[in-house]
UniProtKB/Swiss-Prot annotation:
The keyword Protease does not apply. SMART domains: DnaJ. Homodimer. One of its GO terms (cellular component) is cytoplasm. Binds 2 Zn(2+) ions per monomer. The keyword Zinc applies. Residues 5-69 form the J domain. Participates actively in the response to hyperosmotic and heat shock by preventing the aggregation of stress-denatured proteins and by disaggregating proteins, also in an autonomous, DnaK-independent fashion. Unfolded proteins bind initially to DnaJ; upon interaction with the DnaJ-bound protein, DnaK hydrolyzes its bound ATP, resulting in the formation of a stable complex. GrpE releases ADP from DnaK; ATP binding to DnaK triggers the release of the substrate protein, thus completing the reaction cycle. This is Chaperone protein DnaJ.
Length: 380
């Protein structure tokens, strides 16, 4: 059966933020929860919603899904390109081949990890997009960011149970966290493991839920941290901040926060890596006779000597006037490309001077007063 579009399962767009995905998940999981919805098909929809959030709610798993169009476990069998240069532990953080075979045969190498649902589990990773001014990406900056993340509920200490009570062993999976399901496949009937839909893999049921967190063990809180943006970052680059993601379960560590940098364009410069590009307009007199001009750089104005006879498109290199190299080794260069501007409005004296120049050069002048010499001057 074709794999479902996980974004459609949660009813969100593909460019939805992590907060939008989380809100959609909460809404749908509550709507289809077997304890609240006894309509036919509600349990299957509840499972689908949980499976979709398992992938889209995790920054790394979501990126992998967006790239390959399938969940991590299936990509391992996607041909020579399915591994993408990643190690075998890169299938979305939930294990690699062991979990794949375990899902088919109900045990295997991955069974040892699944046999202990109360083991500490790391929290989800989060993404944060930071927009930088062009100059801030060049020189770096220190700033404070604020975002929402799931933190351990202070009321129940993360257990999800009402204070004074404790979770009990799950009545459906008997504490295993997973149930065995018989599935018809092209290879015949096979047993597979699925997360228990009652305890959601914890092996425990909460009879009296915490009023603060509703039994989840976590609450959404606003979290602020100081961030040092390194000098030389570029559009689309990421920086990982360990343990700044969401809280883990069963005493597990926090996930990580991945900051994705977005850089605003500059009105003066363009950039490619550590190299800065600048277009310098000069007039044809400067190009023909030469000149010394002031040139903008991200480090301040510098003088540049324009040799006589410079042509449009000539590029000069200013060493060390580019962006810092992110991993050290100084700055890149600035490339200055000359653009010769031809005057469009001339007074009588200027026209006569150009006609005299044209005559001395043996060039023809158009009868309407506009010299064909102008076209040649564009390339002086």
């Amino acid at each position: 059966m074709a794999e479902q579009d996980l974004y459609k399962v949660l009813g969100v767009e593909k460019d939805a933020s992590q907060d939008e995905i989380k809100k959609a998940y909460r809404k749908l999981s509550k709507k289809y929860h077997p304890d609240l919805n006894h309509e036919p098909g509600a349990e299957e929809k509840f499972k689908a919603v949980n499976e979709a959030y398992e992938t889209l709610g995790d920054a790394q798993k979501r990126a992998q899904y967006d790239q390959f169009g399938s969940t991590g476990g299936q990509q391992g069998f996607g041909g020579a390109g399915g591994f993408g240069g990643q190690d075998f532990g890169g299938f979305g953080g939930g294990g690699g081949f062991e979990d794949i075979f375990s899902s088919f045969f109900g045990g295997g190498a991955g069974g040892s990890r699944r046999s202990n649902p109360t083991a500490p589990q790391q929290g989800r990773d989060l993404q944060y997009e930071m927009t930088l001014k062009f100059e801030d990406a060049i020189f770096g900056k220190k700033t404070t960011i604020t975002y929402n993340r799931e933190e351990q509920c202070e009321t129940c200490g993360g257990s999800g149970a009402k204070p004074g009570t404790s979770p009990v062993t799950c009545s459906k999976c008997h504490g295993a966290g997973y149930i065995q399901v018989q599935t018809n496949t092209p290879l015949g009937r096979m047993m597979s493991q699925q997360v228990c839909d009652v305890c959601h893999g914890t092996g425990k049921e909460i009879k009296d839920k915490c009023a603060t967190c509703g039994g989840s063990g976590h609450t959404e809180q606003s979290h602020s941290i100081k961030v040092t943006v390194p000098a030389g970052v570029e559009e689309g680059q990421q920086m990982r901040l360990q343990n700044q993601g969401e809280a883990g379960t069963n005493g597990g560590p926090y996930g990580d926060l991945f900051i994705i940098f977005r850089v605003e364009p500059s009105k003066d410069f363009e950039r490619d890596g550590a190299t800065i590009y600048f277009k310098l307009p000069i007039d044809f007199v400067q190009a023909a006779l030469g000149d010394e001009v002031q040139v903008k750089t991200v480090h301040g104005d510098v003088k540049l000597k324009i040799p006589a006879g410079t042509q449009t498109g000539t590029t000069f290199r200013l060493r060390g006037k580019g962006a810092p190299r992110l991993r050290g080794n100084g700055n890149g260069d600035e490339r200055v490309t000359v653009n010769i501007e031809t005057p469009t409005h001339l007074n009588k004296g200027q026209k006569e001077a150009l006609k005299t120049f044209a005559k001395a050069s043996g060039k023809s002048v158009a009868g309407n007063g506009k010299s064909s010499l102008f076209d040649k001057l564009r390339g002086v």
